[in-house]
């Protein structure tokens, strides 16, 4: 054979072997991420202790994968910097630093877990997600959400917390807050005498939020398929059986934004318009309303009783934050919730307020900026280097992040939901990087041609 032909043949063989090796590595990584997604939804009763730390399978996997993500980041590869890439580690460091200031070593132990699952969850899905697997992971997550809904519906079907009782029978795990609420048929677990669907989640509101999020992802990403509408419909059933109004509102917001997205294919400034409208409403309410939190919550369709309860939480919690604005009072800090007769417990039903109380205003802002910063590179759904489903997934994740920010003012997210928030942000940032890197590769190819 001609020497030039032989050289080209050998190069092609070498490139083919490299591609096969990379493909195998990507498939293993994708499988690991799917296993991690399953582990995230394992019930709390399957957690275990290592020393003073209560760990779950998901926490252990996130800790391991975050190390792998940092290692991959330090290797020589093309990286596109998204603001959340910097903000996520800073948020984790601040959580641990603030908790150490307020609670010493004990505070550090508790905050360290939150920092690992939030920052580690972000890093894992930001840097370990293979460039062509985002849609497959989203599809798998939606199928997993359908399974979670089916399991959760066993709660009202059997008139008991089926998953909790099942795991308790195996491991002996008892959660006294559940036992007390079950004994008294408290509203936290019952509505109109019917038990609220919860499944493996820590609370029915969190279950409803998860249904709203994955229903939105399915509806937007797979809108042209029966799969997308089926998942969205099943997710709505889950929201309704959670008997929680806030997740229902999130679902309706997601549906409305999805329809707006479909109806305005050529209107590139659509999200700026939505942002301006929301900003105008918020500014108007805070300018002219004597009880802005109540007004906003009532505008969202929440009952007057719930609206006034959240107003009381913000009034008392706000004073706590202003008393220690930089470092907060710690995740387990005592606060004078009894000073307001409307409050029934020390539970803070507002994610942003709870973070500010635990880690100070900077801690809450850093978490907020992390998830918002994942969308900082702007709309990428029209990128000619993303597939149509990848483009729609980027929009879906942006809508989900919007509902998270909104619900964070009247719902507290912890446990499984806290991890999922980091996962959504990491996937959105990964998609943005994929679009930029493919664009660079295309430009380089055009240059060589």
Protein language model regions, located:
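Alpha-helical transmembrane segments of multi-pass inner-membrane proteins
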Residues: 138-162, 169-243, 248-261
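Transmembrane alpha-helices of multi-pass inner-membrane enzymes
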Residues: 64-68, 395-449
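Long extracytoplasmic/lumenal interhelical loops at the membrane interface
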Residues: 48, 292-362, 378-385
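Loop-to-helix entry and N-terminal half of a specific, functionally important transmembrane alpha helix
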Residues: 32-40, 276, 377-410
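Interfacial loop-to-transmembrane-helix boundary motif in multi-pass membrane proteins
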Residues: 28-33, 83-91, 124-173
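A membrane-periplasm/extracellular boundary helix in multi-pass inner-membrane enzymes
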Residues: 150-161, 259-301, 318-323
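A juxtamembrane structural motif centered on a specific transmembrane helix
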Residues: 1-29, 72-74, 388-389, 422-449
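N-terminal hydrophobic segments of proteins, predominantly signal-anchor/transmembrane helices
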Residues: 28-48, 59-123, 401-405, 449
């Amino acid at each position: 054979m001609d020497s030039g032909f032989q050289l080209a043949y050998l190069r092609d063989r070498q490139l083919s072997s490299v591609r096969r090796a990379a493909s195998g590595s990507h498939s293993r990584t994708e499988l690991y991420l799917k296993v991690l997604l399953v582990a995230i939804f394992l019930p709390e009763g399957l957690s275990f202790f290592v020393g003073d730390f209560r760990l779950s399978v998901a926490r252990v996997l996130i800790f391991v994968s975050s190390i792998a993500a940092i290692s991959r980041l330090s290797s020589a590869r093309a990286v596109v910097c998204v603001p959340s890439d910097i903000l996520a580690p800073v948020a984790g460091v601040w959580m641990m630093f603030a908790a150490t200031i307020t609670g010493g070593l004990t505070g550090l132990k508790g905050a360290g877990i939150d920092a690992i699952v939030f920052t580690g969850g972000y890093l894992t899905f930001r840097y370990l997600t293979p460039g062509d697997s985002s849609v497959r992971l989203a599809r798998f997550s939606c199928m997993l959400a359908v399974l979670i809904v089916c399991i959760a519906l066993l709660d009202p079907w059997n008139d008991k917390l089926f998953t909790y009782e099942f795991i308790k029978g195996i491991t002996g795990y008892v959660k006294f807050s559940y036992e007390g609420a079950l004994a008294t048929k408290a509203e936290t677990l019952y509505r109109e005498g019917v038990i609220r669907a919860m499944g493996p989640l820590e609370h029915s509101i969190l279950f409803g939020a998860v249904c709203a999020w994955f229903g939105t992802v399915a509806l937007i990403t797979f809108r042209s398929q029966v799969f997308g509408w089926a998942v969205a419909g099943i997710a709505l059933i889950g929201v309704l059986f959670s008997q929680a109004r806030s997740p229902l509102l999130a679902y309706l917001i997601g549906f409305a934004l999805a329809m707006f997205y479909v109806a305005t294919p050529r209107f590139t400034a659509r999200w700026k318009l939505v942002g301006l409208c929301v900003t105008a409403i918020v500014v108007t309410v805070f300018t002219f309303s004597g009880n802005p939190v109540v007004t906003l919550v009532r505008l969202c369709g929440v009952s007057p009783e719930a609206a006034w309860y959240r107003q009381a939480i913000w009034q008392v919690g706000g004073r706590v934050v202003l008393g220690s604005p930089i470092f907060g009072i710690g995740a387990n800090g005592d606060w004078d919730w009894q000073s307001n007769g409307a409050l029934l417990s020390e539970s803070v039903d507002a994610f942003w307020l709870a973070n500010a109380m635990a880690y100070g205003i900077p801690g809450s802002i850093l978490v907020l900026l992390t998830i918002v910063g994942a969308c900082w590179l702007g709309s990428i759904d029209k990128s000619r280097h993303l597939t149509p489903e990848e483009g729609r997934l980027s929009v879906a994740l942006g809508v989900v992040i919007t509902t998270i920010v909104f619900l964070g003012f009247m719902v507290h997210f912890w446990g499984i939901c806290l991890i999922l928030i980091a996962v959504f942000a990491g996937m959105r940032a990964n998609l943005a990087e994929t679009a930029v890197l493919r664009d660079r590769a295309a430009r380089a190819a055009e240059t060589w041609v």
